[in-house]
Regions:
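Short helix-boundary/capping micro-motifs
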Residues: 11-29
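Residues within the DNA-recognition helix of helix-turn-helix
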Residues: 29-32, 36-39, 110
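Alpha-helical linker/hinge and terminal dimerization helices associated
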Residues: 43-44, 65-87
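Central regulatory/effector-binding core of bacterial HTH transcription factors
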Residues: 91-154, 223
């Protein structure tokens, strides 16, 4: 039995929580899907599903496998589409891996600036965390990485690098919302905080800055998404220090944004793989992203190439203090 079909069956059962529903979606019999799941579990030596009520849910091992299977199947689909494009001489899409802040805050306007109508570039965008963005570029899965620091790697070319200070997001009925800022860090002491949960990068620098200032906060919610953090802040879970890019894309009612008296830099840019040619349209998109960042962020600073390494090294050192 095709291993690809087995993985497709696993993913459908994981998504739908039912062998019957997965079989209907795949157009095969229920016993066939059951056999495929049993074969996969036998080969791996681990149960991948357990029953909770009427649904099948992934075991911890099954959850770990899911991301890899989704990525592998998406890669197969992309490969098939690229093969058809080569045969049909269609211009392939620019493959981009981006963190959510840049995908949401820069890419749409950069795409519009890079061309209109028939001249607009075709894009294939995957939204990932910073480490996976870098891996996608180095492995060749993506031609462009739109990501945040850390960015230093010998196999990457840093096309441009910029910084902008993080901001404080509070509910519009919060006492701090009545101020104009900048807000001192000590004003956050004892408050409930909606925090970002990534181990490195700006979440680590936020934690290090609060720790260095002796500011004790109660983290009520941690999330990897700025949009998700803002939703919790609006719902009353607390206040939050967030990167500034997401907020430039769309105004969020119920949220007040304030500057901080202590600068916590959000460092971001575009990377490509060293030694790999970059198509002209991809280069135009990279340049357009920089222009959009400069236009959207009043406090944006473009870092000269000769200062890239020292800045990124200093940010990494700051994170290490935590």
């Amino acid at each position: 039995m095709s291993r690809l079909k087995i993985l497709e069956a696993y993913l459908q059962v994981a998504s739908l929580g039912s062998v019957t529903a997965a079989a209907k979606h795949l157009g095969v019999s229920q016993p066939s899907v059951s056999r495929m799941i049993q074969e996969l579990e036998r080969d791996l030596g681990q149960p991948l599903f357990e029953r909770v009520g009427q649904r099948l849910v992934l075991t911890p091992k099954g959850m770990v496998l899911r991301d890899d299977v989704e990525r592998a199947l998406a890669g197969f689909v992309n490969l098939w589409e690229r093969a058809r494009e080569v045969v049909g001489e269609a211009e392939p899409p620019i493959r981009i891996s981006a963190v959510s802040a840049l995908a949401f805050g820069l890419l749409t306007d950069a795409w519009k600036a890079a061309g209109e109508g028939a001249n607009a570039p075709r894009l294939m965008v995957e939204v990932e965390n910073p480490d996976r963005v870098q891996n996608a570029v180095m492995s060749g899965t993506a031609q462009i990485g739109a990501t945040s620091a850390p960015l230093l790697h010998r196999d990457l070319v840093l096309e441009w690098l910029g910084t902008a200070p993080c901001v404080l997001a509070v509910p519009e009925d919060d006492p701090l919302a009545r101020t104009e800022g900048p807000v001192e860090l000590k004003a956050l002491s004892g408050r409930n905080l909606v925090g970002m949960s990534l181990r490195r990068g700006v979440p680590a620098r936020i934690r290090a800055t609060l720790d260095a200032a002796g500011v004790d906060v109660r983290v009520k919610v941690r999330t990897t998404s700025t949009m998700n953090a803002l939703s919790f802040i609006r719902a009353g879970a607390g206040i939050g220090i967030v990167e500034p890019l997401t907020l430039t894309a769309e105004a969020l009612p119920g949220i007040r944004i304030l500057p901080l008296a202590t600068a916590i830099p959000y460092c971001f840019g575009a990377v490509t793989a060293r030694g790999v040619p970059v198509p002209d349209k991809a280069r135009e998109l990279i340049a357009a992203m920089q222009v959009v960042a400069q236009h959207r962020l009043d406090d944006f600073t473009l870092i000269p190439p000769e200062e890239h390494q020292s800045l990124l090294a200093s940010l990494t050192k700051q994170e290490a203090r935590l």
